[in-house]
Regions:
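Hydrophobic packing residues within well-ordered alpha-helices of enzyme cores
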Residues: 11, 57-61, 222
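Short beta-strand-to-loop element that shapes/binds the nucleotide-sugar donor at the catalytic cleft/hinge
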Residues: 52, 127-146
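N-terminal nucleotide-binding beta1-loop-alpha1 segment
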Residues: 1-16, 39-41
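Short, well-ordered coil/turn elements that cap or connect secondary structure elements
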Residues: 17, 41, 64-66, 94, ...
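Conserved beta-strand termini and adjacent loop/short-helix elements that scaffold enzyme active sites
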Residues: 51, 72-75, 131, 158, ...
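Conserved N-terminal catalytic core of the sugar/cofactor nucleotidyltransferase
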Residues: 2, 24, 28-101, 105, ...
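Catalytic-core segments of class I nucleotidyltransferases/pyrophosphorylases
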Residues: 96-98, 105, 110-123, 135-139, ...
Length: 234
């Protein structure tokens, strides 16, 4: 599931005429950075939700085959991160699935991070497994840290603690978490907190470089980070 329905208000004026997932970084759209990472991890089918200027995204992904794209339409109203997943559940099936934000991406170092995430997944112990980055790996992140990792891999809220990690915009989730949820606007944070309470929110520290692009001013640093990361990978 690729979350691509947001308004991208902070990216104006660029997003006055295009949805944020189609903003290009180093010649590739933010959406394609995420979809290419999914393809590299062996994902054959991805659901992309749309709301703002949706026809541009629909047209952009129409010719993709790796992964094949199904559209979850939110033209009638934004549903936030979790509400969008609830609407898309019939397309996502009964098995655990990836969630990827369309406005962040990363440059892998070694084994692809989404492959590592799948290998780390243990449905017997986990309801949600988050990919995490530390502040040193991040470009464009203006906030604080999100989670602290215990020795057993479980997470709790970091509340900005300097030793905390950032949620890197990719996760694996159990679809049954959303079985009783309403198709109404609500955030994934509700499910993160419920999983923390039950000891079933886990995290995996990513390798490589993590890049988030929130405003037009963030584009140049993002492209510099891509160039640097790709040079280091050679």
């Amino acid at each position: 599931m690729v979350l691509a329905a947001g308004l991208g208000k902070r990216m104006r004026p660029i997003t006055d005429t295009m949805p944020k997932p189609l903003v290009r970084i180093s010649g590739k759209t933010l959406l394609d950075w995420g979809l290419d990472s999914l393809a590299e991890a062996g994902v054959e089918r991805a659901v992309v939700n749309v709301h703002y200027l949706p026809d541009q995204i629909v047209e952009h992904v129409a010719s993709r085959h790796a992964p094949r794209i199904e559209i979850s339409d939110e033209r009638d109203g934004l549903l936030d991160s979790a509400g969008g997943i609830v609407r898309a559940l019939p397309k996502l099936g009964a098995a655990p699935f990836y969630i990827v934000n369309a406005d962040t991406f990363w440059i892998d170092e070694g084994e692809p991070n989404l492959t590592r995430l799948a290998l780390a997944w243990d449905g017997g112990r986990m309801d949600i497994l988050l990919m995490l980055a530390d502040l040193k790996q991040a470009t464009g992140h203006s906030g604080s840290t999100d989670f602290l990792v215990a020795s057993d891999g479980t997470l709790r809220r970091a509340k900005g603690a300097p030793e905390g990690l950032i949620y890197a915009g990719a996760a694996i989730v159990q679809p049954r978490l959303f079985a009783a949820a309403a198709e109404a606007p609500h955030s994934l944070n509700r499910y993160f907190d419920e999983a923390i309470a039950s000891g079933r929110l886990h995290g995996m520290r990513m390798s490589g470089s993590w890049i988030t692009v929130g405003t037009p001013d963030a584009i140049a640093p993002a492209e510099a980070a891509v160039k640097r990361a790709l040079a280091e990978a050679q």
